[in-house]
Amino acid sequence: MGKESISLEREVPDLGSSSVKVLLISPEDVDLVWDEAEPLIDLALRHSEGELISSDLIPIIKSGEQQLWVAIEDSEVIASMVTEIISYPRKRILRVITIGGKDGRGIDKWYTFLPLIEGFALKHGCTSLEAWTRKGMVRKLNDWKNSYMVITKDLNQRMQ
Protein backbone atom coordinates (compact mmCIF):
# COMPACT_ATOMS: atom_id res chain seq x y z
CA MET A 1 0.00 0.00 0.00
CA GLY A 2 2.93 2.33 0.59
CA LYS A 3 3.34 5.25 2.94
CA GLU A 4 0.61 7.77 2.65
CA SER A 5 -0.41 10.49 5.00
CA ILE A 6 -4.15 10.50 5.45
CA SER A 7 -5.92 12.49 8.07
CA LEU A 8 -9.53 11.42 8.28
CA GLU A 9 -11.69 12.69 11.03
CA ARG A 10 -15.33 12.99 11.76
CA GLU A 11 -16.80 14.67 14.78
CA VAL A 12 -19.71 12.95 16.39
CA PRO A 13 -21.62 14.47 19.28
CA ASP A 14 -21.25 12.38 22.40
CA LEU A 15 -23.98 11.93 24.99
CA GLY A 16 -22.31 14.69 27.03
CA SER A 17 -20.79 17.93 25.89
CA SER A 18 -17.66 16.40 24.39
CA SER A 19 -17.09 15.10 20.89
CA VAL A 20 -15.23 12.09 19.58
CA LYS A 21 -12.89 12.09 16.58
CA VAL A 22 -11.38 9.15 14.77
CA LEU A 23 -8.04 9.71 13.09
CA LEU A 24 -6.07 7.56 10.70
CA ILE A 25 -2.48 8.05 11.82
CA SER A 26 0.13 8.43 9.09
CA PRO A 27 3.05 5.98 9.34
CA GLU A 28 5.39 8.89 10.09
CA ASP A 29 3.28 9.96 13.09
CA VAL A 30 2.87 6.58 14.81
CA ASP A 31 5.43 7.44 17.50
CA LEU A 32 3.39 10.51 18.47
CA VAL A 33 0.39 8.45 19.62
CA TRP A 34 1.85 4.99 20.25
CA ASP A 35 2.24 5.40 24.03
CA GLU A 36 -1.50 6.08 24.28
CA ALA A 37 -2.63 3.59 21.62
CA GLU A 38 -0.51 0.62 22.70
CA PRO A 39 -2.26 -0.12 26.04
CA LEU A 40 -5.61 -0.17 24.22
CA ILE A 41 -4.26 -2.56 21.61
CA ASP A 42 -2.91 -4.69 24.47
CA LEU A 43 -6.43 -4.86 25.95
CA ALA A 44 -7.72 -6.38 22.73
CA LEU A 45 -4.77 -8.74 22.34
CA ARG A 46 -5.53 -10.30 25.73
CA HIS A 47 -8.29 -12.16 23.87
CA SER A 48 -5.97 -13.41 21.12
CA GLU A 49 -4.15 -16.72 20.82
CA GLY A 50 -0.70 -15.18 21.18
CA GLU A 51 -0.14 -14.57 17.47
CA LEU A 52 1.44 -11.20 18.16
CA ILE A 53 2.09 -8.54 20.75
CA SER A 54 1.51 -4.85 20.25
CA SER A 55 5.19 -4.03 19.69
CA ASP A 56 5.15 -6.43 16.71
CA LEU A 57 2.78 -4.02 14.98
CA ILE A 58 5.01 -0.93 15.08
CA PRO A 59 7.30 -1.76 12.12
CA ILE A 60 4.36 -3.05 10.07
CA ILE A 61 2.35 0.13 10.66
CA LYS A 62 5.38 2.34 10.01
CA SER A 63 5.97 0.54 6.71
CA GLY A 64 2.43 1.40 5.63
CA GLU A 65 1.34 -2.26 5.41
CA GLN A 66 -1.08 -1.79 8.31
CA GLN A 67 -3.00 1.26 9.47
CA LEU A 68 -3.34 2.69 12.98
CA TRP A 69 -6.59 4.45 13.83
CA VAL A 70 -7.34 6.23 17.12
CA ALA A 71 -10.53 7.58 18.63
CA ILE A 72 -9.97 10.76 20.63
CA GLU A 73 -12.36 12.28 23.14
CA ASP A 74 -11.49 15.45 25.05
CA SER A 75 -7.85 15.21 23.86
CA GLU A 76 -7.55 11.64 25.19
CA VAL A 77 -7.09 8.51 23.08
CA ILE A 78 -10.00 6.29 24.16
CA ALA A 79 -9.74 3.54 21.54
CA SER A 80 -7.32 2.27 18.94
CA MET A 81 -7.64 -0.02 15.97
CA VAL A 82 -5.22 -1.58 13.51
CA THR A 83 -6.32 -2.54 10.00
CA GLU A 84 -4.65 -4.15 7.02
CA ILE A 85 -5.55 -4.34 3.34
CA ILE A 86 -5.53 -7.97 2.19
CA SER A 87 -5.49 -8.92 -1.48
CA TYR A 88 -7.05 -12.32 -2.04
CA PRO A 89 -6.90 -13.80 -5.56
CA ARG A 90 -10.48 -12.69 -6.27
CA LYS A 91 -11.13 -9.78 -3.94
CA ARG A 92 -9.50 -7.13 -1.80
CA ILE A 93 -10.63 -6.54 1.78
CA LEU A 94 -9.83 -4.34 4.75
CA ARG A 95 -9.20 -6.59 7.75
CA VAL A 96 -9.53 -5.31 11.30
CA ILE A 97 -6.51 -6.78 13.10
CA THR A 98 -7.33 -5.47 16.56
CA ILE A 99 -9.55 -2.92 18.25
CA GLY A 100 -9.49 -1.97 21.90
CA GLY A 101 -10.93 0.77 24.08
CA LYS A 102 -10.75 2.17 27.59
CA ASP A 103 -13.18 0.65 30.05
CA GLY A 104 -15.15 -0.86 27.17
CA ARG A 105 -16.55 2.58 26.34
CA GLY A 106 -14.15 3.39 23.54
CA ILE A 107 -15.11 0.46 21.36
CA ASP A 108 -18.81 1.33 21.34
CA LYS A 109 -17.98 4.72 19.87
CA TRP A 110 -16.36 3.10 16.81
CA TYR A 111 -19.71 2.02 15.38
CA THR A 112 -20.52 5.60 14.43
CA PHE A 113 -17.28 5.72 12.46
CA LEU A 114 -17.70 2.55 10.45
CA PRO A 115 -18.87 4.53 7.38
CA LEU A 116 -15.57 6.45 7.55
CA ILE A 117 -13.57 3.22 7.70
CA GLU A 118 -15.71 1.74 4.93
CA GLY A 119 -14.91 4.82 2.84
CA PHE A 120 -11.19 4.25 3.39
CA ALA A 121 -11.62 0.63 2.30
CA LEU A 122 -13.55 1.62 -0.84
CA LYS A 123 -10.95 4.26 -1.72
CA HIS A 124 -8.33 1.51 -1.68
CA GLY A 125 -10.31 -0.88 -3.88
CA CYS A 126 -11.66 -3.10 -1.10
CA THR A 127 -15.02 -4.77 -1.58
CA SER A 128 -15.60 -5.72 2.06
CA LEU A 129 -14.42 -5.51 5.64
CA GLU A 130 -13.24 -8.55 7.58
CA ALA A 131 -12.62 -9.09 11.29
CA TRP A 132 -11.85 -12.06 13.49
CA THR A 133 -13.87 -11.30 16.57
CA ARG A 134 -15.56 -12.64 19.64
CA LYS A 135 -19.28 -13.41 19.85
CA GLY A 136 -20.08 -10.23 21.80
CA MET A 137 -18.80 -8.03 18.99
CA VAL A 138 -20.67 -10.05 16.36
CA ARG A 139 -23.95 -9.20 18.10
CA LYS A 140 -23.13 -5.49 17.98
CA LEU A 141 -22.22 -5.52 14.28
CA ASN A 142 -25.73 -6.32 13.09
CA ASP A 143 -25.11 -5.50 9.43
CA TRP A 144 -22.08 -7.82 9.27
CA LYS A 145 -22.36 -11.48 8.31
CA ASN A 146 -20.82 -14.22 10.45
CA SER A 147 -19.19 -15.98 7.49
CA TYR A 148 -17.23 -18.64 9.32
CA MET A 149 -15.49 -19.39 12.57
CA VAL A 150 -11.77 -19.60 13.25
CA ILE A 151 -10.91 -22.43 15.62
CA THR A 152 -7.51 -23.19 17.08
CA LYS A 153 -5.69 -26.08 18.72
CA ASP A 154 -2.55 -25.50 20.78
CA LEU A 155 0.23 -27.93 19.84
CA ASN A 156 2.78 -26.80 22.43
CA GLN A 157 2.24 -29.92 24.56
CA ARG A 158 3.09 -32.14 21.58
CA MET A 159 6.33 -30.25 21.02
CA GLN A 160 7.66 -30.97 24.54
Give residue ranges: language-model regions:
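A residue-level signal for beta-strand positions that form part of recognition/binding surfaces
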Residues: S19, I93, Y148
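Conserved donor-binding loop and adjoining core beta-sheet/short helix segment
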Residues: E65-R105
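Short amphipathic alpha-helix that is part of the acyltransferase structural core
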Residues: G2-L52
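Active-site/acyl-donor-binding loops of N-acyltransferases
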Residues: G2-L8, A131-Q160
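Structural motif
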Residues: I61, E73, G119-A121
